[in-house]
Amino acid sequence: STKMVLANCFDDKGTPSVLPNDYQGQLNLVKSLIAKGHQRIAYLSLSTHLPATTRRIDGYKYALAEAALDFDPSLLVPAEVDVGDGDAGVQLLWDAIDRVMSLPQPPTVICFGNDRMAMRAYGILRSRGIALPDDLSVAGYDGHRMITDTLYPTLASAELPYAAIGIRATELLLGMINGTA
């Protein structure tokens, strides 16, 4: 039979998989932002139907609670931009940014569900006259070096451990093939 291990995804058939710790990644990111003095931290998340989103939101909320910061539901907005969404997806991101930035107490930093969203946000925020990082800080998720290192200012991002996930998936697959897993 065909042996298979999924990396950074899973199915409902119980196929062996290796997943990142999305909870811990978001927790660590938010804790680092709090350590830099941020207290109003918005989170513009990926689609709420994704299990990773639930875990990341839990990490976000726990980091706030651990720092004795109140969770403000108005700072948590789903805003995923799917590649296939076209203009509708871009509009969703614009609307989410406008929503949190027009609050009576706007955030000092916005965390985005992934680095692509954060990259798009740089342009949106600048078009609104918001200076980065003087007026607002931005953080992403994934640690895509092509994005994080290219943007100015550089993007803070929780890094998905792609290499470690690949190595672990390979080890599991080899174990299945050799009958040791």
Label every model-predicted segment:
Residues 2-181:
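Bacterial carbohydrate/catabolite-sensing allosteric modules
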